[in-house]
From Swiss-Prot:
Top-rank lineage group of the source organism: Bacteria
UniProt GO MF annotations: ATP binding; iron ion binding; iron-sulfur cluster binding; nitrogenase activity
Species of the source: Azomonas macrocytogenes
One annotated GO biological process: nitrogen fixation
Enzyme class: oxidoreductase
Name of this chain's protein: Nitrogenase iron-iron protein delta chain
Keyword list, A-Z: ATP-binding, Iron, Iron-sulfur, Metal-binding, Nitrogen fixation, Nucleotide-binding, Oxidoreductase
EC number assigned by the record: 1.18.6.1
Catalytic activity: N2 + 8 reduced [2Fe-2S]-[ferredoxin] + 16 ATP + 16 H2O = H2 + 8 oxidized [2Fe-2S]-[ferredoxin] + 2 NH4(+) + 16 ADP + 16 phosphate + 6 H(+)
Cofactor(s) of this protein: iron-sulfur cluster
Function recorded in the entry: The key enzymatic reactions in nitrogen fixation are catalyzed by the nitrogenase complex, which has 2 components: the iron protein (component 2) and a component 1 which is either a molybdenum-iron protein, a vanadium-iron, or an iron-iron protein.
Subunit structure: Hexamer of two alpha, two beta, and two delta chains.
Length: 112
């Protein structure tokens, strides 16, 4: 699954501004919520839209799913289990690239 993750990660890094928030907790929340909703949409599961935040994350997830289905047609042939594993692996990689492995010291500045 790791070999399939880099293309979708590259798309996020180049096209999705939500991965660029200036604080760790913002990035953690964005990654978690948007990718959770992305997984739900890809797997045909219900998505919670009860709060304004949920709807905001959902819009980003819909855009991501549409782009992935169009650009990476191999996603359309994956089972629900494979899709869930792909998104889980993608999230771990994105968290590393944008949070834990980032050299941006502002992410953890308590005064920022």
């Amino acid at each position: 699954m790791d070999d399939k993750v880099e293309e979708p990660i590259d798309f996020i890094m180049k096209h999705c501004l939500w991965q660029s928030h200036s604080r760790n907790w913002d990035r953690e929340r964005q990654n978690e919520e948007i990718l959770k909703k992305t997984k739900q949409l890809l797997c045909g599961e219900p998505v919670d839209l009860s709060t304004p935040s949920d709807r905001c994350y959902w819009v980003d997830a819909v855009s991501l799913v549409d782009a992935y289905r169009e650009r990476y047609t191999w996603i359309n042939a994956m089972s629900k289990d494979e899709l869930a594993q792909l998104i889980d692996t993608l999230k771990a990689r994105l968290d590393y690239l944008t949070i834990s492995g980032s050299l941006n010291e502002e992410l953890s500045d308590k005064n920022y």
